[in-house]
């Protein structure tokens, strides 16, 4: 599954999302909307108003959403429970 995370400089929720995805071993592409303004415009056109925006297959969301990350891959401790 292809995962893309749209971020911006100095975005605390973006950093938290990146860490959570790395901790679960996901491969993902990051696009910084400060460097790619047309990406920001495209996200706004899709109704997103907050970063990060994560697009993972058929799922997409904005903000730091551990619940959505867990839908992609449960946290290690959840798998053993």
UniProtKB/Swiss-Prot annotation:
- Every copy of the Glutaredoxin domain together lies at 1-81
- Cysteine pairings via disulfide bonds: 11-14
| One Gene Ontology term of the molecular function aspect | electron transfer activity
User: What are its GO biological-process terms?
Assistant: cell redox homeostasis
| InterPro entries, sorted | GlrX_NrdH, Glutaredoxin, Grx-like_ET, Thioredoxin-like_sf
Q: What induces it?
A: Induced 2-fold by hydroxyurea.
**Keywords in UniProt for this one?**
Disulfide bond, Electron transport, Redox-active center, Transport
PANTHER family in the cross-refs: GLUTAREDOXIN, GLUTAREDOXIN-LIKE PROTEIN NRDH
Summary of the function given for this chain in its UniProt record: Electron transport system for the ribonucleotide reductase system NrdEF.
Q: Which family does it belong to?
A: Belongs to the glutaredoxin family.
* Name of the featured protein: Glutaredoxin-like protein NrdH
Organism listed in the record: Escherichia coli (strain K12)
Name of the gene encoding the protein in the UniProt record: nrdH
